[in-house]
Design a protein with these regions (language model features):
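Predominantly extracellular beta-rich ligand-binding scaffolds that present long acidic/polar faces
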Residues: 87-94, 101, 105, 549-651
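Short glycine/acidic-rich loop motifs that flank beta-strands on beta-rich extracellular proteins
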Residues: 88-89, 281, 308-314, 350-356, ...
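Bacterial Sec-dependent N-terminal signal peptides
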Residues: 1-32
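Beta-propeller domains
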Residues: 223-230, 239-240, 266-292, 305-308, ...
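Extracellular beta-strand solenoid repeats
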Residues: 78, 85, 91, 105-107, ...
């Protein structure tokens, strides 16, 4: 069933959206111990269906007492219908563990809608004031970051106003912090600034700590991205400012005055509405260790709702990836074995939905619905102490003579042999922008299967590092990705592992001299196969810095093609790239990369590739001109051109008609994404593109100056290869090593951003700047190299 897509609607009725479990499990034998919980129960009761407990704490104490160290038959904790407003998370330790044959089951009653809520109800007496703004007193000490009225998410007073049709942030403004606007704020302390990274590589969040004079604010925060930069000059907004409360559905909490302000829609009396405010970050917590794990527990049929936003706590760097993280989620799992989380709903959450933290083995996260989430959906994150010679920023590295060169992990404190399958994930990253549907960092042998992921600000699936590989990523349907950021993919990975160095020259020397370093961390091959990916704002599959030891086959790429930046041992075959193709960037001399038997619809878009790996050949083209362009590069000797006669492209079936399996082999293109009936009826599908046989874009103008060949940065590929924050600047393509420019420090691959104080966006800017400053014999230029700005003085 194809459903219409909305991008990030936040004002959403969610009161009746949680799962209703309809006999997920059959009746158990009479020996099963059943413990009941009801919103009308009491912890002084017996826990029976006629005398239920009121809390999960009481039920878990009953489990512990019943077990008392003995082997027992199966135990079920059954929530009866209702909303359970928790005042603290439900904690489960090893003492309540089940067994392989009799797991502890925590579930909703058959047919019951059960909500675990992290919010508290607000008892408010509203009084109408000026300009349509109502006010109500709250108890001293009350604080919250999000608010709901009759199950509708309300908007914290903000500028610019919320617009669900605008990305990013549902509204942004370059003047959000302008002196003129700041001057109108009497006391902005506690306000929040949300902004994209200058390169749109995720986002930042800052708290306003006060004013410096009349028209400037002071800020703290901005630690939510592991690639520090200034905030984006345009993509930013402010919230939690009283003076910005100026439109319907906005609210503002004055903590000093203990007063809540709200502007309802015309004709609405807020005294007739039910208000709740999220308080808890976590609703269920499984906590064990490798020596004493929580094990054999199943959680099903519950709806996790209303957790508090956690964006100001996102600060821990995940090795040298672009991410920082906050280790928390509505469902938090650490030190668990053989536990299953099935057919639950995670809706209207302020932070992460599910966090699998450090040591975990044999977990299954399956059949869940995850939507309207402030941060990420499913996160598998290990302990950096398990990594040998870790580094924690792009520009950091461990010198070889200090490096631990033992292969593999240092400890077992990371997720391994876990599965995330058949999950429906969409409309996440509503607050934080460096998030993913499934995030993997410092983990091994995960199975990410049959998930449907869409409407995300960045990647649908992200693998942050090579430690320790062995993942299977298959049968997923991932689309509407990278909607609010840039230079990324529907699938994205980094591999800044032990061999990787921020200076390319040093990395080349290191990997040539010590090739054994390459797979010290990525010890197992990660397989990406039989997925459907679509990214209209980047690449469908993006293996970025250092990503190594991958096998990629049988994937249908609908828009952005496939990119391999520098890395090793990538075998890519039998993929279909609609209206796009292959993007190799800055390859190593001995990469051992293979790209063969794929269908491409444009010539290879290589950038700074001198060496073509082990094999780039036997690929299938739709146009003779594209093949000839690639053959002129010394590759694709046995490439072929055929008529791309697809079976049923309008319905996404891009198998070749009457194909005899000559090299390329047809594969199933009709069964991606979720498989459970419940989720299939709720899921959307990607827009299927019409195949267009188009020539690759004509290369832009080139200009020779002082023995150097220059051109404008014109494509996303050129931007990504250089690590630029935007498609701007002038790229140096060729340079005579005997020239003055070379002696002045310029190198091939440098991007000129500024010449003698003149901003350089394209080639004509550089030409005009040189003419303007023709008398300057030592002009200063600002260049971009190794993803950093450098200033050089040219000796002309």
């Amino acid at each position: 069933m194809k459903r219409s897509l909305m991008l990030f609607p936040k004002l959403l009725f969610i009161g009746l959206t949680c799962a209703v479990t309809l006999g997920v499990y059959g009746q158990q034998s009479g020996s099963v111990k059943r413990i009941y919980i009801s919103t009308k129960g009491s912890d002084r009761n017996q826990g029976t269906i006629d005398s239920p407990y009121a809390t999960a704490d009481a039920a878990l104490r009953s489990v512990e007492k019943y077990k008392n160290g003995k082997n027992t038959p199966g135990i079920e904790i059954i929530f009866m219908a209702g909303t359970y407003q928790l005042d603290k998370p439900i904690q489960m330790s090893a003492v309540v563990s089940g067994t392989t044959t009799h797991p502890l089951r925590i579930k909703s009653a058959d047919g019951a809608k059960v909500i675990l809520s992290g919010a508290k109800s607000l008892d408010l007496k509203w009084q109408e004031g000026d300009h349509g703004i109502w006010a109500a007193k709250v108890p001293r000490g009350t604080n919250f970051q999000s608010l709901y009225a009759n199950d509708k998410h309300l908007v914290r007073a903000r500028y610019p106003n919320y617009d669900p049709t605008v990305l990013p942030f549902q509204g942004y403004a370059a003047d959000a912090l302008s002196p003129e606007r700041v001057a109108t704020w009497k006391n902005p302390k506690g306000g929040i600034v949300h902004a994209l990274h200058a390169g749109r590589w995720g986002g930042f969040h800052y708290e306003i700590t006060g004013k410096d004079g009349l028209s400037t604010v002071t800020l703290e925060g901005g630690q939510q991205n592991n690639r520090p930069s200034k905030m984006h000059e345009t993509y930013r907004f402010v919230e939690n400012i009283f003076e910005e409360l100026d439109t319907f559905q906005e609210w503002y909490l004055d903590e000093q005055e203990a007063t809540l302000y709200f502007m309802p829609a015309k004709g609405i009396n807020p005294n007739q509405l039910k208000f709740v405010a999220p308080q808890l970050e976590n609703l269920i917590n499984l906590s064990g260790s490798s020596s004493n794990p929580v094990h054999d527990i199943e959680v099903s049929g519950l709806c996790f709702m209303y957790t508090a936003p956690t964006f100001m706590k996102t600060a821990e760097p995940l090795l040298r990836s672009d991410w920082t993280i906050y280790r928390q989620g509505a469902l938090m799992i650490e030190g668990a074995e053989n536990c299953t989380f099935r057919a639950n709903d995670f809706i209207e959450l302020g932070g992460n939905a599910i966090f699998v933290n450090k040591y975990n083995r044999g977990l299954k996260i399956e059949g869940n619905r995850i939507e309207q989430v402030g941060a990420g959906a499913i996160n598998f994150v290990g302990d950096p102490e398990a990594v040998r010679s870790p580094s924690f920023r792009y520009e950091k590295f461990v010198p070889f003579d200090q490096m631990d060169t033992i292969k593999g992990p240092r400890t077992n404190n990371y997720p391994k042999d876990c599965e995330a399958s058949d999950n429906l994930i969409h409309n996440i990253g509503l607050i934080e922008k460096q998030v993913a549907g499934v995030q993997v960092s410092m983990a091994e042998s995960l199975r990410i299967l049959h998930n449907t992921i869409y409407n995300v600000p960045r990647a649908g699936i992200n693998v942050g590092d090579g430690t320790w590989g062995g993942h299977e990523i298959a049968y997923n349907d991932v689309f509407n990705t990278v909607l609010e950021t840039s230079d990324h993919g529907a699938f994205n990975s980094w591999g800044r592992d032990r061999f990787w160095h921020p200076n390319r020259k040093e990395m080349d020397e290191l990997t040539t001299k010590h090739p054994n370093l390459i797979l010290l961390d990525a010890i197992k091959t990660t397989k990406i196969h039989d997925n459907r990916f679509r990214c209209d704002h980047g690449w469908d599959i993006d293996l970025d810095d250092g990503s190594s030891n991958y096998e990629i086959y049988n994937n249908l790429c609908l828009s952005g093609g496939l990119k391999l930046r520098e890395g090793f041992y990538r075998k890519v075959y039998n993929n279909v790239m609609i209206n796009n193709g292959f993007h190799p960037h800055v390859w190593f001399q001995h990469s051992h990369d293979v790209f063969r038997n794929n269908i491409v619809m444009q010539s290879h878009q290589d950038i700074q590739v001198k060496y073509w790996g082990e094999e780039v050949d036997h690929n299938i083209y739709g146009l003779q001109g594209d093949l000839e362009k690639d053959q002129a590069k010394g590759i694709e000797k046995d490439g072929r051109v055929i008529q791309l006669n697809f079976t049923n492209p309008a319905h996404g079936d891009f198998r070749l008609k009457n194909w005899k399996d000559q090299g390329f082999k047809n594969f199933d293109m009709l069964h991606f994404g979720v498989i459970s009936k419940r989720l299939k009826t709720l899921s959307a599908s990607p827009e299927i593109p019409q195949p267009i046989q188009s020539l690759a874009k004509e290369q832009g103008g080139r200009w020779t100056w002082k023995s150097g060949l220059f051109k404008s940065v014109e494509t996303l590929g050129e931007q990504s290869a250089a690590g630029l924050p935007s498609v701007n600047g002038v790229l140096l393509l060729q340079l005579d090593e005997k020239s003055n420019l070379y002696r002045s420090g310029l190198r091939v691959g440098d991007v000129v951003l500024n010449y003698q104080g003149e901003k350089i966006d394209q080639l004509i800017d550089l030409q005009q700047a040189i003419k303007k400053h023709v008398h300057a014999d030592k002009p200063k230029v600002l260049i971009f190299r190794n993803q950093q700005q450098q200033e050089l003085t040219l000796q002309l």
